[in-house]
A protein has these predicted regions:
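Long, structured stretches of catalytic cores involved in phosphate-ester chemistry, encompassing
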Residues: 1-173
């Protein structure tokens, strides 16, 4: 599940990829064939390992080039604005609920979220500065030019919801 493969791919190819993953990785297969899971180390650490590809919506394709070197996504032009669309997901509803519940109920001191994506934005140019917002209050929040890559940037609404959940539930560490 990489190089542009997502939940809209050929079902047989996706099933074959999942089967190959389970055959190659030293993990126990559960009845749901899910690859997201948690690993505990006593009462000290719980690592929540995410599957950011199997359930994801298609990535937002690049629509710009930055400095002639990098493919980029300009959020002011199609299809870049899709990055902010409500409901876009990389986790899927069941996994997101599992993650929220796991964060809320674990008794581990340290909670680690393992994601194959960078959680931090890869923003090259910021269009949401105080100066620009003063000129145009209707600017897209977090608008800008982002590096085009497999990242949480393509799923900003879901990332925002997850971060708000962590904050509102006072999830520490």
């Amino acid at each position: 599940f990489y190089n542009g493969v997502d939940s809209t791919g050929d079902p047989q190819r996706l099933a074959n990829a999942r089967q190959a993953w389970f055959e190659a990785m030293p993990v126990k297969r559960d009845t749901d064939d899910r690859t997201y899971r948690s690993i505990r180390w006593g009462n000290l650490t719980e690592m929540l390992l995410l599957d950011t590809r199997q359930y994801r919506d298609p990535e937002v394709p690049a629509n710009a080039t930055f400095a002639g070197l990098l493919d980029a996504q300009d959020t002011t032009a199609p299809p870049g604005e899709q990055m902010f669309a409500p409901g876009r997901t990389t986790l899927g509803e069941a996994q997101l609920q599992w993650l929220k519940e796991s964060l809320a109920t674990t008794r581990a001191k340290w909670k680690i979220i393992g994601s194959s994506y960078d959680m931090a934005p890869w923003k090259l140019v910021d269009f949401d500065t105080p100066e620009l917002r003063a000129e145009n209050p209707d600017l897209q929040k977090n608008g800008g030019i982002y590096v085009s890559n497999e990242a949480w940037d393509d799923y900003q609404d879901e990332r925002r919801k997850l971060m708000r959940h962590i904050e509102s539930e006072n999830v520490s560490n």
